[in-house]
C-alpha cells in the first residue's frame, strides 16, 4: 500500500499515551441498550480519578457483541466528556474491513487521539492480508495515530516481528497494545521499534513486569475497578520503589483472582463492584456473556471490600 501522507515520527506526541489507561466498560440501560448517561458517568469517573486516558470499545467494552451504531453512540458520549481531559484510544476493528473503516472515520471525526484494531478473527489469514486489513483501517483515518492490538489468545493470530516490521512502514502506526502473556514480547517489540514507538502492557496481572521490561503505558480491563491502586503502582515503578510496587501488584492480582471466581463474567462483577464502591449504574453484560447469579453477590461484596482495604493500605 502506498501511503499518501508521510507524518514525521519526530512530531509524534507519545507522552499522552504514557501512563494508566483503563479499558472502558460497556454501559447498558435496563433494556440492555447503550446508556448514554452511563457512558458519560463512567467517563466523568475516570476524569475524576486522574487516569491518563481511556481505551474505548475494546474487549472490556464488549465490542464483539455490539453493532456499529452501538459503538458510535458509546464513543460520541465518551468524547462529550473526555475531550481535552483524557487521551482517548478507540478500538474500531469489526469482523469486516468496511465496518472497521466506518468506525475509523467516525472516530477521527470526533477527534480521538488514536484508533486501534485487533487482527481479523475466525479465518486464519496470511500476514499480508492482516497488514492489508490494518492499513485499510488506518487509511480511513489518515490523520489519526494507529495502535496494533496483539491478543493472540483470543484473536487466534499473533503479531510476529516480520508483520510488525511491515506495519511500521505505515507512518500512522505508533505502537502495540500487547496482551500476549509472555512479557518477553514487550521487550522484543520495544527493542525492535525503539523510542519512536510506544508499547502498552496488556495483561493486568503483570503490569509491573511489563512496565519494567519496556512498556511505557498500560491498558487494562480491571484498572477501572481500582484505578487508584494502578496509579499508585505506576508511581512506585517510576520512582524505583520496587518492593512497594510488588506488594501493590500482588494485592491487585488477588482482587482479580477473586473477581474471576464468580459464575458471571468478570465484567459483570466489575460493574457490580463499581455500583457498590462508586455508585455507578453501568447495567449488566450483553449475552452471550454470562450474567451474575445470586451466589455471585458474596464474591462481588468480598472483591469490593478487598479494593477498599487495599486502598487504605497503600494510598
UniProtKB/Swiss-Prot annotation:
The active site is at residues 149, 177. Pfam families: DHDPS. Its EC number is 4.1.3.3. Disruption phenotype: Deletion of the nan cluster abolishes the ability to grow on sialylated substrates. The fitness of the nan mutant is significantly impaired, with a reduced ability to colonize the mucus layer in monocolonized mice. One of its GO terms (cellular component) is cytosol. Aceneuramate binds at residues 59-60, 179, 202, 204-205, 221. It is an enzyme of class 4 (lyase). GO terms for molecular function: N-acetylneuraminate lyase activity. InterPro entries: Aldolase_TIM (IPR013785), DapA-like (IPR002220), NanA (IPR005264). Keywords: Carbohydrate metabolism, Cytoplasm, Lyase, Schiff base. Induction: Induced in the presence of 2,7-anhydro-Neu5Ac or alpha2-3-sialyllactose (3'SL). It comes from the Bacteria. GO terms for biological process: N-acetylneuraminate catabolic process. It catalyses: aceneuramate = aldehydo-N-acetyl-D-mannosamine + pyruvate. It is found in: Cytoplasm. Pathway: Amino-sugar metabolism; N-acetylneuraminate degradation; D-fructose 6-phosphate from N-acetylneuraminate: step 1/5. Catalyzes the reversible aldol cleavage of N-acetylneuraminic acid (sialic acid; Neu5Ac) to form pyruvate and N-acetylmannosamine (ManNAc) via a Schiff base intermediate. Cannot use 2,7-anhydro-Neu5Ac. Involved in the degradation of sialic acid, which is present in the host mucus layer and represents a much-coveted source of nutrients for R.gnavus, a prevalent member of the normal gut microbiota. Homotetramer. Belongs to the DapA family. NanA subfamily. This is N-acetylneuraminate lyase. It comes from Mediterraneibacter gnavus (strain ATCC 29149 / DSM 114966 / JCM 6515 / VPI C7-9). The gene is nanA.
Amino acid at each position: 500500500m502506498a501511503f499518501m501522507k508521510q507524518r514525521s515520527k519526530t512530531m509524534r506526541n507519545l507522552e499522552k499515551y504514557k501512563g494508566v489507561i483503563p479499558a472502558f466498560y460497556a454501559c447498558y440501560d435496563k433494556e440492555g441498550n447503550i446508556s448514554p448517561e452511563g457512558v458519560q458517568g463512567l467517563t466523568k469517573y475516570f476524569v475524576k480519578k486522574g487516569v491518563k486516558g481511556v481505551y474505548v470499545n475494546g474487549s472490556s467494552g464488549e465490542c464483539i457483541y455490539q453493532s456499529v451504531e452501538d459503538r458510535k453512540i458509546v464513543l460520541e458520549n465518551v468524547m462529550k466528556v473526555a475531550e481535552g481531559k483524557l487521551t482517548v484510544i478507540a478500538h474500531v476493528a469489526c469482523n469486516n474491513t468496511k465496518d472497521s473503516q466506518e468506525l475509523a472515520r467516525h472516530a477521527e471525526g470526533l477527534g480521538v487521539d488514536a484508533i486501534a484494531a485487533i487482527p481479523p478473527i475466525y479465518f486464519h489469514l496470511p500476514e499480508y492480508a492482516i497488514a492489508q486489513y490494518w492499513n485499510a483501517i488506518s487509511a480511513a483515518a489518515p490523520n489519526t495515530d494507529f495502535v496494533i492490538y496483539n491478543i493472540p489468545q483470543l484473536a487466534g493470530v499473533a503479531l510476529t516481528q516480520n508483520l510488525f516490521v511491515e506495519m511500521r512502514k505505515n507512518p500512522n502506526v505508533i505502537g502495540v497494545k500487547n496482551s500476549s502473556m509472555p512479557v518477553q514480547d514487550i521487550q522484543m517489540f520495544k527493542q525492535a521499534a525503539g523510542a519512536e514507538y510506544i508499547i502498552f502492557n496488556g495483561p493486568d496481572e503483570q503490569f509491573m513486569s511489563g512496565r519494567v521490561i519496556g512498556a511505557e503505558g498500560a491498558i487494562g480491563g480491571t484498572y477501572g475497578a481500582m484505578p487508584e491502586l494502578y496509579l499508585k503502582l505506576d508511581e512506585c515503578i517510576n520512582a524505583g520503589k520496587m518492593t512497594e510496587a510488588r506488594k501493590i501488584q500482588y494485592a491487585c492480582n488477588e482482587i482479580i483472582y477473586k473477581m474471576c471466581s464468580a459464575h458471571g463474567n468478570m465484567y459483570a462483577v466489575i460493574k457490580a463492584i463499581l455500583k457498590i464502591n462508586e455508585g455507578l449504574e453501568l447495567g449488566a453484560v450483553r449475552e452471550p456473556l454470562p450474567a451474575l447469579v445470586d451466589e455471585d453477590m458474596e464474591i462481588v461484596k468480598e472483591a469490593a471490600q478487598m479494593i477498599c482495604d487495599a486502598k487504605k493500605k497503600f494510598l
